[in-house]
Design a protein with these regions (language model features):
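N-terminal polybasic phosphate/anion-binding patch
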Residues: 1-83, 93, 97, 207-220
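GST superfamily/GST-like fold recognition
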Residues: 2-30, 121, 136, 145-220
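Residue-level signal for inorganic ion chemistry
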Residues: 25, 63, 88, 111, ...
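Active-site-adjacent loop/tail segments of enzyme domains
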Residues: 83, 89-123, 150
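Short beta-strand segments
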Residues: 85-87, 128-130, 177
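Short beta-strand-to-turn element immediately C-terminal to the catalytic PLP-Schiff-base lysine
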Residues: 92-93, 130-134, 184-185
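Anionic-ligand binding region
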Residues: 108, 113-116, 120, 128-141, ...
Length: 220
């Protein structure tokens, strides 16, 4: 753990292209610089699930793999050091195929399949966050789990939502902060976690790393 003599960091690197994560960091006043993947990096292989892998294990593994890739990127670019933040979000429907991992839809047909699975049911949204405090240490990480209950969706409702384009690029084929909010009856847990970055848990990691932001605290 860091102590009070450790360096303070005025910014972090965000190793994610998610506009929602950028928005959430701005919401709590965290300054960041992008450490986005290169176009040639193989994100699909990192995000591929293993046979019979549980959603919690999957999202934690993928986030740590992203952290390793981000560290390599940082070294290759010879950037000054600051903590590196990575995150990954997935959706799981308990009881369906042993808790099938419902990632980003491949196409409209897959989006329809996922939305029909979630219709009228309660599913889990799991977001893992990893913060690498120094280049020589393992990242500190957490997994936050929330529950989301969907209303019963009609065929027309699903078709219109898919036509909006919003399901694509989002785990579970919906976004809670957009049109997808009209699909949701209730949530239990972290709204920001469902968006892609649980701010309470992430702020605890920032405090540990002594990242400065408006409500930061120092840990002895």
């Amino acid at each position: 753990m860091l102590n009070s003599q450790s360096a303070m960091f005025p910014f972090i690197y965000l190793a994610s292209q998610s506009p929602r994560r950028q928005e959430l960091l701005k919401q709590i006043g965290v300054k960041y610089e992008m450490l986005a993947p290169e176009p040639g990096e193989d994100a699909e292989s990192i995000e591929a699930s293993h046979p019979n892998e549980k959603a919690r294990d999957y999202v934690a593994r993928v986030t740590l793999a992203k952290s390793e890739a981000a560290l390599e990127r940082h070294i290759e670019r010879a950037l000054p050091w600051a903590p590196i933040l990575c995150a990954d979000t997935t959706v799981s429907l308990p009881g369906h195929l042993g808790g099938e991992i419902l990632g980003k839809p491949f196409d409209a047909v897959d989006a329809e399949r996922i939305l029909k699975l979630l219709s009228g049911k309660t599913h889990q949204v799991l977001t893992a966050v990893a913060l690498r405090i120094s280049p020589t240490s393992e990242p500190v990480s957490i997994v936050q789990t929330s529950e989301v209950t969907f209303t019963k969706l009609s065929e027309d409702h699903i078709a219109k939502y898919i036509a909006s384009g919003e399901p694509f690029g989002k785990a579970g084929a919906y976004g809670i902060q957009g049109l997808g909010s009209s699909l949701i009856e209730s949530i239990t847990g972290s709204y920001s976690g469902i968006m892609g970055l649980p701010l309470f848990e992430t702020s605890q990691l920032f405090n540990l790393a002594q990242v400065t932001y408006p409500l930061s605290t120092t840990h002895e």
